[in-house]
């Protein structure tokens, strides 16, 4: 059956919709943008501690602590900041964790396969920012309420994993850029966690990088754009001896640690 001829008004509206970009679609999920760059933007050479389990050791002489958003109290964050520390708060932005306080707000339709080695976590369908956006914004708001200086969003490389969804590189870039813009709108610093293959496309959006085991897998060169942009690159090795990676990490101007996989208080710093 032939379609009726569209009216000029209808055609105009149709053409306007054709030009709507993904950025326009995402606008409702962002607050008014904070102009300027007043959030923390670390340069290479920042001493740090990454502790996500066990009793927090607050006695370290470091510039920055990376701690769990949900498990760390506002009073503990306040204590660290009173000592002159910057506090980054860990949150997973690409996986569902069944033990989190807000686990019940994620609909089943955005939950994918379980992460390899992590039976309590499932990949998220990051193409559904209409669903995940409000949830992640509430987490960022919690970071602001607790006094975090920034966030470490984990598992933001689902497109390159067996997530259970046919995620594309472009969908991942869109989601990761959205995370960065939403964090900055709240005056939060944000780091690019792993996702090495997209560093070139994301270095201008993120304030620093955090990597696990790039020396073990011989892929640290992919992080150099951050250092070249004057941005800190934090990282850890779990299995390698410090004698096998610290010298190279220092020469690349990376801030590297040797840590236990449990990310308890134990650490050895390369510099």
Regions found by a protein language model. Give the residues of each.
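Glycan-processing catalytic domains of CAZymes
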Residues: 30-271
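Bacterial N-terminal signal peptides that target proteins for export
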Residues: 2-10
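Short, cationic, amphipathic peptide segments
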Residues: 26-28
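Bacterial N-terminal signal peptides
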Residues: 10-18
């Amino acid at each position: 059956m032939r379609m009726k001829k569209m009216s000029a008004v209808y055609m105009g509206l149709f053409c306007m919709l054709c030009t709507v970009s993904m950025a326009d679609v995402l606008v409702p999920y962002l607050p008014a943008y904070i102009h300027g760059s007043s959030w923390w933007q670390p340069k290479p050479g920042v001493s740090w501690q990454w502790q996500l389990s066990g009793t927090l050791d607050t006695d370290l002489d470091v510039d920055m602590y990376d701690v769990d958003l949900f498990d760390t109290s506002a009073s503990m964050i306040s204590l660290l900041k009173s000592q002159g520390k910057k506090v980054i708060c860990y949150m997973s932005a690409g996986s569902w964790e069944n033990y989190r306080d807000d686990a019940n707000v994620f609909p089943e339709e955005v939950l994918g396969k379980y992460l390899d080695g992590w039976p309590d976590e499932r990949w998220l369908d990051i193409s559904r920012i209409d669903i995940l956006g409000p949830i992640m914004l509430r987490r960022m708001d919690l970071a602001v309420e607790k006094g975090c200086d920034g966030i470490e969003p984990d598992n933001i490389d689902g497109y390159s994993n067996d997530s259970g969804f046919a995620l594309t590189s472009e969908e991942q870039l869109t989601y990761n850029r959205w995370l960065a813009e939403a964090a900055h709108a709240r005056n939060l610093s944000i780091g690019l966690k792993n996702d090495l293959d997209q560093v070139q496309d994301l270095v201008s959006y993120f304030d620093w990088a955090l990597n696990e085991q790039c020396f073990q897998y011989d892929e640290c060169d992919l992080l150099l754009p951050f250092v070249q942009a004057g941005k800190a690159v934090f990282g850890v090795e779990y299995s390698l001896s410090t004698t096998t990676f610290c010298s190279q990490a220092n020469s690349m101007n990376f801030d590297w640690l040797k840590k236990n996989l449990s990310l308890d208080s134990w650490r050895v710093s390369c510099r």
